[in-house]
Swiss-Prot record:
A lipid is attached at residue 23 (S-diacylglycerol cysteine). PROSITE patterns: PROKAR_LIPOPROTEIN. Required for the insertion and/or proper folding and/or complex formation of integral membrane proteins into the membrane. Involved in integration of membrane proteins that insert both dependently and independently of the Sec translocase complex, as well as at least some lipoproteins. It is found in: Cell membrane. The gene is yidC1. GO terms for molecular function: membrane insertase activity. Keywords: Cell membrane, Chaperone, Lipoprotein, Membrane, Palmitate, Protein transport, Signal, Transmembrane, Transmembrane helix, Transport. This is Membrane protein insertase YidC 1. The lineage of its organism: Bacteria, Bacillati, Bacillota, Bacilli, Bacillales.
């Protein structure tokens, strides 16, 4: 269930790029921009990127986007911990959920049976301390950041016209190298995050997501500004390392509890 929420939110984030690319506001963004969205969301992102690029020796706007991504993701670590704990609780509950599913069988044709099944499943999740929305908060928070970053890049002349490596940050990668890297890191990141899922039904669903999500990233990356694709890549790499570290910490905590 958690994976379904994540898949929907990731899909919405990617769809956001497609929609934004067709309705981008060309008005330059600066400290005098008005409106809640421009002044409190887009401009702060633009300011952060410009500040890093201008004040850190050797930094470019590409490096500034990478640093800004790392800062944002680091600030979201507490939410990631909550997300991982939620995933661990869901894994522990799988045997009980499977028993419940076997008890009721196919409930699609019996409304009363379906209601009872949903009620018992909700009670089981509540007793296990699992909240399906806990794992979605990092994605929910990233969506406005994602949108603000798009506008910060496209509406800040200095960022939009700057280059990093072989790409112009305000335009799509002409060689499609960054979108391919973004798709590959998305695939690997999903494999790492989902490697402790055990149920057969989940495995089939996750295999489908592991194909669909990177494919969507690749498709959107062909049209997205290179600065935004750079944000995806950096975020994926950070999430991979974060998941590996958190998994080790959680496993150590579980071993200590078993020994106590």
């Amino acid at each position: 269930m958690l994976k379904s929420y994540r898949a929907v939110l990731v899909s919405l984030s990617l769809l956001l790029v497609f929609v934004l690319s067709g309705c981008s506001n060309a008005t330059p963004i600066d400290a005098h921009s008005t409106g809640i969205w421009d002044h409190y969301f887009v401009y702060p992102i633009s300011f952060m990127i410009q500040f890093v690029a201008h004040h850190i020796p050797g930094a470019s706007f590409g490096i500034a986007i990478i640093i800004m991504t790392l800062v944002i993701r680091s600030a979201m670590i507490p939410l990631a911990v909550s997300q991982y704990r939620s995933q661990a609780k869901m894994k522990k509950m799988q045997p009980e959920l499977q028993k419940l599913k076997q008890k009721y069988g196919d409930v699609s044709k019996d409304l009363e049976k379906q209601k009872q099944y949903q009620k018992e499943m909700s009670e089981l999740m509540k007793s296990g301390g699992w909240n399906p929305l806990a794992g979605c908060w990092p994605l929910l928070i990233q969506m406005p950041i994602f949108s603000a970053l798009y506008y910060a890049i496209s509406r800040t002349e200095e960022i939009r016209t700057s280059t990093f490596l072989w790409v112009n940050l305000g335009h799509a990668d002409p060689y499609h190298i960054l979108p391919i890297i973004a798709a590959l890191t998305t695939f690997i990141q999903m494999k790492v995050f989902q490697s402790n899922s055990t149920s057969g039904e989940q495995v089939q669903m996750l295999k489908m997501q592991q194909i669909m999500m990177p494919a969507m990233i690749l498709f959107m990356g062909f049209a997205a500004p290179s600065g935004l694709v750079l944000y995806w890549i950096t975020g994926n790499l950070f999430t991979m390392m974060q998941t590996i570290v958190l998994r080790k910490i959680m496993e150590r905590e579980e071993l200590q509890l078993q020994k106590a």
